[in-house]
Amino acid sequence: MADDWRQVCETYRRAITLSDVESKNDPENEPYRSKYRARELLREVRVLLCPEEEEESEAEGKEERRDGPESGGRRGESGELLAARLAVVEFRLGLNHTETEEMSAGEEHLVKSGRIMERFRLSEEGVSVYIQAQNNLGILWADRGEIRVAQRYLESAESLYYQYMKEIGKPAIDPDEHFFSEEQKLTEQERTKRFERVYTHTLYYLAQVYKHLKQDEKAAQYCHTTLQRQLEYDSYNPVEWAINAATLSQYYVTKQCYMESRHCLAAANVIFSKAEQIPSAEAAKENEAEQERLDLLRQKKAEIARCWVKYCLNLLQDARKKLEDNIGELDVDIQEELKAQRQKEEDEKEKDRKKAILFGSSDIYDSVQAAEEKVECSHPLDFKEAREVFLVGQNYINESKEYFQLDGHVTDHIEIIQDHSSLFKLLAFFEEDYERRCKMHKRRIDMLEPLCKELNPQYYLLICRQLQFELADTSYEMMDLKVAIGNKLDEMDTHTIKKINSLAQTAIKYYEMFLDSLRSPDQKFPEKLEEDVLRPAMVAKFRIARLYGKLISTDGKIQLENIQKSLNNYKYIVDYCEINKEAIKCIETELELSKEMVALLPTRMERLRIQLASFS
């Protein structure tokens, strides 16, 4: 009997080695060679466990008989133990079939594994294999797009874990341990670690399911718990963990939970640094695998950096929304009010919330806290505070650009440059000095303009439109600032007038480039604008109209031409909305002003014509 059992164990372990280790070296033309051999060995194990049964029906037949597995199989074994061993073999066969893309057969074995263990699912021998079968059925149904079915399996696994821990609480036996010799048996500590890892997988898959079901808050909670447990049980890949934590931070950003977001990002930095030593470029040149690994690490580091950039951008953006008045300028009264209120609230809030979200144990706590202290999580309320957030964001911009370069990563690189531009735009809001604010906007033009000139609209039409519109907006904003500076002078000097005109003409140029991109191949402007470009196109028309009105000229004829161009653009908006009533709701403010200008400008033009006639 002992020799028979030794043969069973050796056959099972050989199957696992083939499946988990040797399969990695299978040739490309036989990618599943080791998996198929492992399957044959697992079937042998099943026959050895139940020699008197038909191979295809022994496990199911035993469970369906009144007495269950104890009524047959190897003499002297308890029904519970035999059931557990059979369930493990069925579970492994289920995995084997899913790994070789035979999903229906895989499902059949996984369901059979669960059915065998149904009565014993709360036992030390059975709980782990039962939960793992449920987990894998959840994955299988999720891959089929049947998310609700996946949810039922995974929530069943979660519920069983809670019930087992409440009613039994002992370290569960790992499935493979059923085929270990006495000397190979796991310690209670190792059993606990493996069982908790199984449950962590349940939570991880549930997080994905809730995300698919648009239950974002629940998905975030499960993701957070998964990350905490992976640290607690030292069961994680540092790079994957860091990416998942950085991704979770973006959810917290959308909820304006900046302390939680910062904590996730700081922890991501600390755990990412635990990834193995990045190989030198020289070593990578000699080893293709090392080169791939180096590239992956650089990419993931850049992705985490981009999450930090989004954190800084959103923190500044939300601060701006709190502080701006009805014309988009910083409201000093609100600023003082928020400063007074912040100190009272922040300390208590941080203390309470931190208890709920802390990652990891004392060994990484200090490092995470040090990373957190490099950037605030409360809204900046003045230029000094905003600049500190800006500098952190800019540092991560530079870090992300190291990997996402224009050559090879066009879209990503341009998004990063656009984020850099947005950082300058948000910082400019906090700057009181108009000249310094202009310089910040000039930095934006300097970084965006070369990209706009370099990209071919034939291949990057949407990106080109974004750049054209942002360049136009930035020039428009600079012109407004220069007008405000000029208005403070007793008399506007020639240099200021030239600058205002130059900026206005640049803004007009880019708005018109944007509008031209909407034309058909035969250069006709669309009679009806698509919904996604309707508001941008109307805003462009409105601002072109206003810009022509801002151009300064001493030549009456040029003044008349500019007013006419201004009128034409205002009139376009009014006429378009007259024909397309549904457009009114997205352009209400601009439409009202356009109607006023359409009524006023002809009178102004007539007065100017009379003046010109009197001088001729």
UniProtKB/Swiss-Prot annotation:
Keywords: Cytoplasm, Cytoskeleton, Developmental protein, Differentiation, Neurogenesis
Biased composition (Basic and acidic residues): 59-78
Subcellular location: Cytoplasm, Cytoskeleton
Annotated GO CC locations: cytoskeleton; mitochondrion
Stored Pfam families: KBP_C
GO biological process: cell differentiation; mitochondrion transport along microtubule; nervous system development
Cysteine disulfide partners in this protein: none
Magnesium keyword on record: no
Protein's UniProt keywords contain Transmembrane helix: no
UniProt region (Disordered), positions on chain: 52-78
PANTHER family found in the cross-reference section: KIF-BINDING PROTEIN, KIF1-BINDING PROTEIN
Family: Belongs to the KIF-binding protein family.
Function: Activator of KIF1B plus-end-directed microtubule motor activity. Required for organization of axonal microtubules, and axonal outgrowth and maintenance during peripheral and central nervous system development.
Protein name: KIF-binding protein
Organism expressing this protein natively: Xenopus tropicalis
Gene transcribed to yield this protein: Kifbp
